[in-house]
Amino acid sequence: MGNPRSPLDRRLRFRNVPFLPPRIAASSTTTARSLKAKTMEMRFTIAWMWFPSVLLILGLLTPPSNGCTVDVGRNVSIREQCRLRNGATFSKGDIEGNFSGPVVVELDYEDIDITGERQRLRFHLSGLGCPTKENIRKDNESDVNGGIRWALYIQTGDAKYGIRNQHLSIRLMYPGEKNTQQLLGSDFSCERHRRPSTPLGKNAEVPPATRTSSTYGVLSAFVVWIGSGLNIIWWTGIVLLAADALGLGERWLRLALSHRDKHHASRTAALQCQRDMLLRQRRRARRLHAVSEGKLQEEKKRQSALVWNVEARPFPSTHQLIVLPPPVASAPPAVPSQPPEYSSVFPPV
């Protein structure tokens, strides 16, 4: 049926367009059904796209509370669990017991980065002995009485090609010498694409062998980074959010561009509708008048169209004509039927 408030509705043909109120003549063509559809679309967008996407972005911006876990190895006890502090990872523990010979410590370090990807580092520490005075005298023996406190320190460098470069250092602190800290290099075996380097300072140059971006190119690193299941979920939400934001931006831009011509377009549509209706009324009147004409009307039209000096009968009038009395016979006619003689008008000289 259409929208009765629309100026283009076919039911307006039978209305008096010049006397239509302006709010009806210039109203939009939005129906109640389309408004309901837009409302449902907005609810669907908020429920299934915006809300999960906002949660995913908040999850990306919020760092994990426990960034890593340390699994104990042989004769190792964890005193303090791994945590994040100022962008660096710390883990502390104690090696307890009485040891004869070199100490072997095996630790599994598992890192959860900000993108939710898990990376496990397995490193092997061997030959750890307490450098007491007795052990210094003995070249081939190392006895540990009491304990050795160890600390794991991992600092994350700048991201390159989607791979984080980490610097790992081990610190050993002995009970007898509390103010002494010794940095030890170790034999590391790293799974996946992370290769921790030897202890480095802040401004130290990273050796080429420890650069993670040298082995993997841009494409392979991107595939490895996106390949995680959790990353796929996050990126799906981000893509949906971007698509919805683009659609909403396009709708707002189109509305802003068409806002200027909205009044002009509605007025033009109303005037065009009025013109069409007037033309239809004229055609309808002509058609009805042509059908009602008979032979008598055609004869009258033909006689009225003749030359002026030919006598024609006038159209009948609704008003009664005033009938004058006939002229007296003795009186000369007011207008002679014959032209006068020449001699009577101009007498001869």
UniProtKB/Swiss-Prot annotation:
Main subcellular location: host cell
Domain of life the protein comes from: Viruses
Topological type in the membrane: Single-pass membrane protein
Cleaved signal peptide residues: none
Keywords noted in UniProt: Host membrane, Membrane, Transmembrane, Transmembrane helix
GO cellular component, as recorded: host cell membrane; membrane
Region (Disordered): 328-349
Disulfide bonding pattern of the chain: none
Biased composition regions of type Pro residues, renumbered to the chain: 328-339
Transmembrane segments: 221-241
Subcellular location(s) per record: Host membrane
Name of the protein in its database record: Uncharacterized protein US30
Gene label: US30
